[in-house]
Swiss-Prot record:
Broad EC category: hydrolase
Cytoplasmic topology ranges: 1-23, 79-93, 166-189, 232-260
CC per GO annotation: endoplasmic reticulum membrane
Organism: Xenopus laevis (African clawed frog)
Keyword tRNA processing: no
Catalysed transformations (reactions): an acyl-CoA + H2O = an acyl-4'-phosphopantetheine + adenosine 3',5'-bisphosphate + 2 H(+)
Designated name of the protein: Acyl-coenzyme A diphosphatase FITM2
Length: 260
């Protein structure tokens, strides 16, 4: 258990710290722009990471929101209850995950709709001979290649999940442990979320340097950052909202940190 605690402290000190939280939106924007320019001006040679069948893409990125939701659900429950002692406040905070799910659903479907209305079906990726098909599904069913404006869903969701995790894990610095199992459970969840952030940042970088064009990646990243800004920087500050994590709320209101 000591190793787990040391690991959690290391992640808190080196990765999920206040400086990283504050500068992460700028970092993501730089990765999206820098990686896109690298892809356009000096493409990297093929590697394991531009193979869509790589293990992180197949087992993690494909289920990006599921992994984020699955790990944040118990973390928010335990940490928010320890800081507030109120089941009502915990349920209110958990509703932020429903809001995140709604943003994920709406944006994903919007991207698919844009790709549909801007796309056409072709016989191959060379985009030489077009085929008459109504939509992407029908096109692919008949062996065609659908080409439209494909906003990067990876850039959107990875950036959004990274920023959400950073917001929700900010409570870790405010918790004082009295019980061993509290420390063990929360440290384990915090460590898992820290590893997940590292995976998401790495795969965001891989997407930036290997896939899509610059406009598709920048727009996808902008949607992810906008969804985060609308919620955590504006709406969650309002009385009728899921609210900010307890540490963030008390910090912004200049109140003493919650203790249990």
């Amino acid at each position: 258990m000591e190793r787990l605690e040391n690991c959690a402290q290391m992640f808190q000190r080196k990765f999920l710290n206040e400086a990283f939280r504050r500068h992460c939106p700028v970092l993501l924007a730089c990765i999206a722009l820098g990686g896109s320019l690298l892809k356009e001006l000096s493409p990297l040679p093929d590697s394991y990471w531009n193979n869509k069948r790589n293990v992180l893409n197949v087992y993690f990125v494909k289920f990006c929101w599921g992994w984020t939701l699955w790990l944040l659900l118990p973390f928010i429950t335990l940490t928010n209850y320890k800081l507030t002692g109120s089941i009502t406040k915990v349920l209110r905070r958990l509703s932020s995950l429903l809001v995140g799910t709604l943003f994920w659903y709406l944006c994903t479907n919007l991207f698919l709709y844009i790709e549909h209305i801007t796309g056409s079906c072709y016989e191959s990726e060379a985009l030489l001979d077009s085929i008459e098909h109504q939509d992407r599904k029908e096109c692919r069913l008949h062996g065609g290649f659908w080409h439209g404006f494909d906003i990067s869903g990876h850039c959107f969701l990875l950036s959004y999940c990274i920023l959400i995790i950073l917001e929700e894990t900010s409570v870790i610095r405010s918790i004082q442990f009295e019980r061993h199992w509290h420390r063990m459970a929360i440290n384990a969840q915090f460590t898992a979320l820290s590893i997940l952030v590292i995976i998401w940042v790495w795969m965001f970088l891989c997407t930036a340097v290997y896939f899509h064009n610059i406009f598709q990646k920048v727009i996808g990243t902008a949607f992810g950052m906008l969804a985060w800004y609308i919620t955590y920087r504006w709406w969650y500050l309002q009385p009728i909202s899921p609210g900010l994590p307890p540490a963030s709320a008390s910090h912004s209101e200049k109140e003493p940190v919650y203790k249990n």
